Curated annotation (Swiss-Prot):
Pfam family, any one: GHMP_kinases_C
EC number of this enzyme: 2.7.1.148
Active site per database record: K16, D141
Designated name of the protein: 4-diphosphocytidyl-2-C-methyl-D-erythritol kinase
Keyword match Zinc: no
Enzyme class: transferase
Lineage start: Bacteria, Pseudomonadati, Pseudomonadota, Betaproteobacteria, Burkholderiales
Reaction(s) catalysed (UniProt annotation): 4-CDP-2-C-methyl-D-erythritol + ATP = 4-CDP-2-C-methyl-D-erythritol 2-phosphate + ADP + H(+)
């Protein structure tokens, strides 16, 4: 990352994985209570920010299928600008590599990186808690990326507690299908009454010799998604022939863990050509963590 008084270049917006995802209830307002562990990855979109003195917020790169006015990156910048009444503006460039509708948190991570980067570039010095309260307005996953550590999540995903996770290499496989999150959450067959677990339950599994991630929990959305989307079911089956695997978020991406980069790359080399595969190492901390206190 390059840092100057007028620009911030090469700011990573890391992907996340849901190591498990349990839905424990549904609220009267339609939101779902969940439990999950969010894992940061050293892989994601890259954003570049150049300060403007005319107060305008502009996305200067095209993102296919995402109009500028509805882009979470632009919305995040405008939200922060309105909250602080700063006179500054910004040009935002996005090198987009994370697939959309994949359960990797791409748009949410882009928004969080924008809030963190502009907190530094605009010299706002807002505390992390204040940025997290703004982030909730942009989406349920955005506060996690501001939190900036691997986390045990509860509530709708906004109640976060840091967890220490071992270093792992992951193969993340995404078929060419977009899975709308709202469609999966509204499915009548979705499990919504999984028994709550504790952080201690999860951490005890981390030191066991059982196969991982099969050794703890599940993704309650996976059964619904694989029933609706044959492409996702095919990825799960293919990966299971290699090693235990699990869908992240509401899909469509599926991940498997490996002890080394070499093992993950070897599995990736065998993927069908129609699937997008990426090898990524786990992260313990968001790359822009120091941009808020």
């Amino acid at each position: 990352m390059t840092d100057s008084t007028r620009s911030l270049r090469n700011c990573l917006a890391p992907a996340k994985l849901n190591l498990f995802l349990h839905i424990t209830g549904r609220r009267p307002n339609g939101y779902h209570d969940l439990q999950s562990v969010f894992q940061l990855l050293n892989w994601g979109d890259t954003l570049h920010f150049t300060r403007r003195d005319d107060g305008r917020v502009a996305r200067v790169t095209d993102v296919p299928g995402v109009p500028e006015e509805s882009d979470l990156v632009v919305r995040a910048a405008n939200l922060l600008k309105a909250h602080t009444d700063t006179a500054h503006g910004v040009d935002i460039e996005i090198d987009k590599i994370l697939p959309m509708g994949a359960g990797l948190g791409g748009g949410s991570s882009d928004a969080a990186t924008t809030l963190l980067a502009l907190n530094r570039l605009w010299q706002l010095d807002l505390p992390r808690a204040e940025l997290q309260s703004l982030a909730v307005k942009l989406g349920a996953d955005v506060p996690f990326f501001i939190f900036g550590k691997n986390a045990f999540a509860e509530g709708i995903g906004e109640e976060l507690a840091e967890v220490e996770l071992p270093t792992r290499w992951f193969l993340v496989v995404t078929p060419r299908v977009h899975v709308p999150t709202a469609e999966i959450f509204s499915d009548e067959l979705l499990t919504r009454d999984t028994k709550p677990v504790t952080i201690a339950d999860f951490l005890a599994q981390q030191t066991s010799d059982a196969e991982w991630p099969d050794s703890f929990g599940r993704n309650d959305m996976q059964e619904v998604v694989t029933r609706k989307y044959a492409e996702v079911a095919q990825v799960v089956k293919w990966l299971y022939d290699v090693t235990p695997a699990r869908m992240t978020g509401s899909g469509a991406s599926v991940f498997a863990a490996f002890h080394s980069k070499h093992e993950a790359e070897a599995a990736k080399a065998k993927l069908p050509a129609s699937w997008n595969g990426a090898v990524a190492e786990s992260l313990n901390e968001h790359p822009l963590f120091a941009f808020a206190s």
